[in-house]
């Protein structure tokens, strides 16, 4: 599949195609094709053999067949989503949850990021119960397992943007309830990576509907205001990039506007001293913009700059 040999020859395209076709055929005993058996038997292989098997899996999954460039292994996985579930739930093989097989979990992680490249397979995963288990996997205390799960989580939510937006809108409450809980209670690395991903998702135009629902929530804004006061500077910094979306929203609810108005002076003072040692021109400009927006938010009964009464007052 990869060429090599004594002469370090390049891969033979015909042999690659033949291997992809042969491994896509169902077995005679009705137990599935080579793809299925490889997924199911992976934890039982020796370490180096397991790595080779995963490399072969990734290669045959992406190898096109014929003039129409069909992907038989993608089609097979699409028709057998239980195999995708096995791959997603592989973090449970790790030492904290079941069998103490961290290496197998990490190998499955490379396979998960490979299948995420294909929209049909990614759809199965994003709408599955197994996907929500990834919040638990990202909070494992074993750093390698948690980081690998976070890398796969990010790939699933950013590879196919329209699909991800559909999944987030459909599963909004169950997704963000878990996401916010992770931001409050997760470990430092998970919280920092998750905040960074959240700001990226909210600012992506594909997720405009998701963004408007998220920033309409008082609870979400209060969470970001609390994270702005976190002990870790990097958490504060990432929270800032989410909080700015609430402040910049021209269609704030009366409740959100009221909270910002009541905390206006404290927020302006906080921003004035917020990480001024950062040599980041864009960050400085965004801080200045937020400060101007907050200063223009007159409290109820006061007049905003320009002589107009603040929103929500009569």
State the predicted function of each range.
Residues 176-290, 294-314:
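Structured C-terminal portions of repeat-based eukaryotic scaffold domains
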Residues 1-107, 114-131, 138, 146-147, ...:
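Elongated alpha-helical scaffolds that mediate protein-protein interactions in large eukaryotic proteins
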Residues 141-142, 147-188, 192:
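Active-site cradle of extracellular carbohydrate-active enzymes
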Residues 37-48, 83-103, 133-144, 177-189, ...:
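Helix-loop junctions that connect tandem helical modules in alpha-solenoid scaffolds
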Residues 2, 46-47, 57, 127, ...:
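Phenylalanine-focused residue identity feature
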Residues 57-59, 109, 113-114, 153-155, ...:
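Structural signature of alpha-helical solenoid repeat scaffolds
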